[in-house]
Amino acid sequence: MSNEESFTEKPLKKRSRAHRLGDPRFYCTYPDCPKSFTRKEHLRRHERTHENVKAFSCSFCNRAFARSDVLNRHVQQMHLQKQNLSERRMLNASCFLGFCVLAHDYVNLINARHFMIEHFLSLFAFCRTILFSLLTSFLLVPPPQFFHSEAGERPTPSVGAPSSLASSMDSVRVAPSMLAASHQIVPQYSENNPRVSNEPPRVTIENASLKPFSGYIKSHMSTSNFLNGEPDLNVNVDLSPFPNLPATVPITQAASTANAFQQPSNQFQTQKLPSGLDTRPVSSYPDELTQLESNPDSFSRLDLQGDCTCIFKNRSSIASSRTMDDVVRWLFSSGKRRQKYESSYPYQTQSNQIPSQDQYSDTDSNFLSYYFSASGPMYVPQKCPATVYNNLLNFLEGSFHLQPNFLAMFTLESVSSWLNAYWSMFHVRWPILHRGTFQITQAPLDLLLSMITLGMHSSNDLSIRSLAVEIHTTLRYNIYQKQEFGPPVSLWVYQALFLIQVFELFTSNLKQHRLAQMFHPVLIEAMRQAIPSDALTVRSETFGESNTPLTLQQWHKWITRESVKRIAFFVFALDSTSTLVFGNQPLLYVTDVSMPLLAEEHHWEAENFEVWAAQKPTIEPPTILHMLKAFVQCEQCESPLPKLSPWNMLLLLHGLLSVDISLKQKKFVPGMKLSKREIDGWCSLVFEAYQKWNRCYYSIFLNNNILPFGHPFVKECRSLYNLACIYSKTRLTYLQAFAKAVTDPVDGSVTSKTVAPLRYVKIWANTENARYSTSNALEILDMLLREKIESAPRYDTLIYHSWCYYVAALVLWSIGFALDEENKKTEEVTNLHSQMSRYVTKVRQALEQGEPLFAVVEKSKNPIILHVVLQALDVFPWDLLGEHKKIIQQLLSKGND
């Protein structure tokens, strides 16, 4: 059926007069979008909903709009009408000031009794001059430029422009303090006579009408460049596969306030201070950080000769989005276009080629096999010292005010077991602490508690897990009140806050999860404000080819430097995970962590200095950006790549996900002047990079039995890969909206609410995107069949592993509902797992042989898949899964009707 016929069959919808059968229609070129329009301007307006680009911004309040007429109406109603009222009030106040001066001079004339007639005539001339100057100052000043097609085309006042023109954008903002500011007279500063007289200045005809406004302008010029002269577009893109989940608290204002003090105000620029004084304001950042965005070459990676680096490259999310444009063009450039974009790429080194495989040592398979097995001296239980235990009890009783029954659970043996559980279970997934130099006796109690509570989470006792949640209600705020949280912030503070956030994501409490989403931007913003004098900056003096013996000081510097990289990379991983699973706005991009990848794990896990010095790392790992380019630009999928550690491979997957999310948002389309088809081609290259990553991961770690299939770390890697692939090819919001509409208790299987989602599902089910998503969903179900479903709740180190089951069930149910027209009833069977296993094997073999989906999918198998997935989700005690489990239950009840 053609699209034209589909429109003719719409029931109960009046056809437009302008549209007749046979007229040309303009179709949306975005994949899986079935919409078409009779007018081209309507199509362009619809395309902006895909791109979500708001190119028309208000010069007053920096609000952004997708249409120019809406911007014009906003300016007229919200600003110009108020501006006229404020101008009249300002004129009345200024006239009152002028007449006061006139009366004062008139009294002086009466007292002087000299040349009365001459002064009386001059009073009228003076009054006329005042009124004329007031009218010209308001009527002849050019208004601010509101209407521009692009946000970046707004004219900025030049240095030599008049003060009235340069401050026209601020002069229209009438504050309550305007009248008081208009009476302030700025004292004249002179190099020859720096003293300021205490006598009131004499008002003359030349300065009577200009001084009040110049004082107001100078007092408010500091806020005119709040965002460095660029508007905050406030682009909000719904990337959520699950739109009803709690979203992150918006922090665009908090993330952008970092740029407020990067440029000193005009008062500091005009006054000349003595040469011995610093002309930079106290609140401004160091010069080397203000130059980071314009000339970031020296900060692109940790230099081998001892240059300093900051934990995050960009000081704000706005700067991150700008640098992401150049990175995307550099990643996908090839041939002539590569030469064009590489000149502006800020992360170039002397050689952009990826080092070959023989330049890196092979992954120590014996170490990894030993590391991922819960045995060996690495996991020898250690006992907590009695002094640390007593200090911990006093700390809990004094700062947390725990009840006596809770304090009784903190025995010396239990604290030791919880610490050992952290090292054996959670350190494998988040290795941010250095085990060789970590000493319990010297660790801060807040950091120690964050480790202990993670170990308490693995307990099967509900009271112990409740105690851990009770501690976390105060632990974060207790760290905020520490002296170490102020600048310069200590490294252990960031490590403790990161572990707290991981704990809140693990717990099943909805309140704890929302706290993690709320305070995640706070952690990122605190890490952005780190300056080179803080503890987060170290020097790279370890790497090199010199044969000089290493010292203990160099080892500690290397540990600090590696700790900084790990906390930065893992915070970035959490941010990309929240964007993928929970639909939050990305606060970090891969450009923020443009650093070399993590060092080999056997270097990081060295027990002492002698072991580390014996296996001295002589070559630094490649940067994450160059490895991403290797995956994207690799023409032959089977070409060899450097063998990286499992943690670096997972970081590369997060980097690909960050690039994919940036392409989906289309933030940089107007500036880059690219077509949507080219952007879609780039998305296809990212999907091919996903597949390349999966083949490399299997060939390096799984096929050689280096990593066990059942390890939680491996499960999380495979889960993230399948989720990213499905996200790249499927709009899960449409699928879930359709599932909710089907379960709506209305007579009839198809209602007015299900027309649009059903049309998308039917179009999507007949494309190649559905085949890719089906393949990933089958792999997720295969992981489910390999696991042992227990009746007791499971508390492990997986964050988003359970979400894969719901996504896979949603994808397969939608395809079966759309392609299979037959309505067969499900046979009553006792062993659902075996029947689902046969169905998964059948569909997978058909896809490998190239058969179409409609020939192999069966709608009658949907209840079997939903039953098994619902049984698996009941094992994970997450409150966030409650609504999705309810959707599955409603689908099952709907199918049985």
From Swiss-Prot:
Alphabetical GO CC annotations of the entry are: chromatin; nucleus
Q: Which cysteines are joined by disulfide bonds?
A: none
Transmembrane residue ranges: none
Q: Which UniProt keywords apply?
A: Metal-binding, Nucleus, Repeat, Zinc, Zinc-finger
Q: What are the subcellular locations of this protein? A: Nucleus
Q: Where are the zinc fingers (C2H2-type)?
A: 26-50, 56-79, 93-119
Identify the SUPFAM superfamilies for this entry: beta-beta-alpha zinc fingers (SSF57667)
Tell me where on the tree of life, at the top rank, the source sits: Eukaryota
Q: Would I find tRNA processing among this entry's keywords?
A: no
Classify the main location: nucleus
Q: Name one Pfam family in it.
A: zf-C2H2
> CDD domains attached here?
fungal_TF_MHR (cd12148)
Keyword Cytoplasm set for record? no
**InterPro entries in UniProt:** Transcription_factor_dom_fun (IPR007219), VerF-like (IPR051059), Znf_C2H2_sf (IPR036236), Znf_C2H2_type (IPR013087)
Instruction: List the Gene Ontology MF annotations in alphabetical order.
Output: DNA-binding transcription factor activity, RNA polymerase II-specific; RNA polymerase II cis-regulatory region sequence-specific DNA binding; RNA polymerase II transcription regulatory region sequence-specific DNA binding; zinc ion binding
One GO BP on record is:
DNA-templated transcription
Q: Report the protein name in the record.
A: Zinc finger protein zas1
Organism of origin is: Schizosaccharomyces pombe (strain 972 / ATCC 24843)
Record lineage: Eukaryota, Fungi, Dikarya, Ascomycota, Taphrinomycotina
Q: Which gene encodes it?
A: zas1
